[in-house]
Amino acid sequence: MSKKILLTFDYELFLYQSGSLENCILKPVQELLSLFDKLNIKGVFFIDILYLKMLRKDGLKEDENKFCKSIHTLVEKGHQVELHLHPHWLDATYESNKKEWNLSNSDKYRLQSLSPTELEDVFTEGYNLLTDVCKQVDNDYKITAYRAGGLCIQPFDVLQPLLEKFDIKIDSSVATELKSESKAHFYDFTKAPKQAIYNFSTDPTVIDKNGQFIQIPIFSYQKKLINKISGKLFGTSGIGNQKFGDGKAVVPQNNVRSSVFSRFKADFYMYSLDGDYDEGLLLRKMKNEKNDIITII
């Protein structure tokens, strides 16, 4: 059975120590676009737009222009540009000696950590900023989808009115089987349906056929002990896994390993071209996936 692959990307700097715009966004995106042009395919880019707010706040005009021009290129080439919000940008500080941002303060990592008024202000500003940038190229451009920063879409009840307000019908924040709880992250998708696309209303992990929202989840696959061993023995774990950029990320804390024996348990990994992945295993899992649509992050 042939598969449809949805290529989605979080268009962002590293979110602990940012690294540079040039190395973390501009160069890798340009490589992607060159490949996409050659293969005649399109991608979905979720733009971490609060970065633009901070560039303007600190008067970093050169980076602002480069960032906006890159988004313009995405729109001009027919790629989908959608909303992505990391509110801990509000506490970020620019380190001029390093020419990068310090985002180590994660108190506001999740939108749900904000007061109701601040949450609405941040969401509204982010939506308007991204819409304005896109309309500089296409006056009819409309944002239709959202991905929560760090996938932290739960609890959804505080975000639902804002998606309704701006007529955003699609969410792509659910990663099946995954769970994380730390100072920065919180999500629990362990009960999410393994369905490529579904409607929901008040809970993005529960199907509601009459729901007004559409969930396009990122699927996960299981890496068993035998896969881990073969990856180590034959050097396949991490093939093609080259790190782009010069920053440091905020790593989600999944199931904490309490003993050495827990290292031998199977783990779940998103269908992803980011982070620690085994290319051969990923391709085999995708080929054997029962769903005919696969979303990759």
Positions of predicted regions on the chain:
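Active-site beta->alpha N-cap acidic-glycine motif
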Residues: 1-77, 147
